[in-house]
Amino acid sequence: MQELKSLSAYRQGLKGKILDTAMTLFARNGIKAVKMDDIARTLNISKRTIYELYENKEVILFEGIKRYNQRREEEMSQFVKGNTNVMDIILNVYKVKVEEFRFTNSLFYDDLEKYPDVMAYLEKSRDENRKELIAFLNKGVKEGYFREDINNDLVTILFDSIGQLFLQKRLYARFSIESVLNNIMFISLRGICTIKGIEVLDNFLKSQAE
């Protein structure tokens, strides 16, 4: 029985390693360019071992993105527990996104469109995030960082549209993530902020420019 438990733990650990390795390769080279052989070679395991755990590359991509999102959600939950306000959360997300995109090849985003199941999952995630964003906006109003006269539904649609614009217009291939966030996201965010919120944004952007 103990041997079976050990084997099961090993397989679960290996599954996670395969996903993490594959996602690193996908981000570095684009999804299409990465073959199962590349993943196996990087991990120093046989391709057969990978196929015993995952049916194909699309399944690895799908599960890898899910795993990545779950980790990000857990990290954000831990960050939020530190009695942070909405502006702290926004600026933390900014730093995470900048770091994330800095190590991601633009081909990765181009290739995503070729995987409908993955795109459907991402769309579902966006729908769930919209509900969380409304609660976030209400929190910002209570804390005095966001204006009381904003329409939460319209603001949510606006920020969701910005995210889709980033992918559909391939802004990631033409501009740095800092430029996109500073010129589109932060300008839109500034419009819903109170003087208190604007001061936090301006101080942050000033510190980034120094």
Which residue ranges define each predicted feature?
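Hydrophobic alpha-helical bundle segments that form small-molecule/ligand-binding pockets
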Residues: 127-155, 159-166, 170
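Hydrophobic alpha-helical connector segments
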Residues: 63, 74-103, 156-159
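Basic, helix-initiating cap at the start of DNA-binding domains
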Residues: 1-29, 33-45, 59-62
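C-terminal peripheral helix-coil segments that are non-catalytic and often amphipathic
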Residues: 1-2, 135-139, 143, 175-210
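Short secondary-structure transition hinges
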Residues: 98-145
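Short amphipathic alpha-helical segment with a characteristic S/N-K-E followed by hydrophobic residues
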Residues: 56-61, 71
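Short hydrophobic/aromatic patch on the recognition helix
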Residues: 44-54
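Amphipathic, non-transmembrane alpha-helical scaffold segments
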Residues: 11, 65, 69, 119-130, ...
